[in-house]
Amino acid sequence: MVGFKATEVPPTATVKFLGAGTAACIADLITFPLDTAKVRLQIQGERRGPVQAAASAQYRGVLGTILTMVRNEGPRSLYNGLVAGLQRQMSFASVRIGLYDSVKHFYTKGSEHAGIGSRLLAGSTTGALAVAVAQPTDVVKVRFQAQARAGGGRRYRSTVDAYKTIAREEGLRGLWKGTSPNVARNAIVNCAELVTYDLIKDTLLKADLMTDDLPCHFTSAFGAGFCTTVIASPVDVVKTRYMNSAPGQYSSAGHCALTMLQKEGPRAFYKGFTPSFLRLGSWNVVMFVTYEQLKRALMAARASREAPF
């Protein structure tokens, strides 16, 4: 057995909720530069973007984007929006991942044998619910990642200033900008990510190919990351473009997608695919492995506290 041993008592809903948020924050800390590179690549080619310095930069590939940002804006630019990103994960991942098992059991009426339909429904539900809770943090994160530090093109001085400025200039609706594509994206992402992880892990365990420990969690998470990136990239690009757009640039998420298709062609929907996969693949591995271990560690700590002397 590699890592913490599974406890006899299954993790509580609270343990899953806190464990998911904490694991997601750890994963974000490690993979955030890849996410920032993905955002810069996704908005590239958007000629009328609000941050011209960022939008007009010529980024080529993951490494090229990271090197260009470090050269022009300094290493700290790779972590633009990190505070909002961590705020997002604590509210977002806690709901979409931490509540997944509980919602799945609700749809299966407590049965241990969950079908693909119940898993998909649970993933869609928690993914959409998480967006409703965490959308403002996602908007601020994307705005920070998109803005360039060089050339005086910064839109916001701090995370708090970003929330205040968006609310003042665009109204409260501005903080929930892009909710529709984000709900669609996260329903898709959650289904692809959690359901694929669930299915791969169950298959490996039932076929006795692996035991329920770190190698199994690593393999399941990596496979889930690839499947999720392929499925979710188009709606992810639209979400990023729309949330970063100036007021009036696009009338809706659908208009944003149509404009991309007309001006840049179908390939635009897979801009930033490589950093998306590198980020999501590595993020999934770190998050799921950490999450599984945190659940076991927290339950072991709880058991030791409750054990009689």
UniProtKB/Swiss-Prot annotation:
The UniProt entry's GO biological process terms, in alphabetical order, are: adaptive thermogenesis; C4-dicarboxylate transport; cellular response to glucose stimulus; glutamine metabolic process; glycolytic process; macrophage differentiation; mitochondrial fission; mitochondrial transmembrane transport
Q: Which organism is it from?
A: Sus scrofa
Question: Which family does the entry's similarity section mention?
Answer: Belongs to the mitochondrial carrier (TC 2.A.29) family.
From the UniProt entry, list the residue stretches annotated as the region Important for interaction with long-chain fatty acids.
Answer: 16-63, 278-285
The protein's name: Dicarboxylate carrier UCP2
Name the source's superkingdom.
Eukaryota
Solcar repeat start and end residues: 11-106, 114-203, 212-297
User: Can you tell me which residues the record assigns to a coiled coil?
Assistant: none
Keyword Oxidoreductase among UniProt keywords:
no
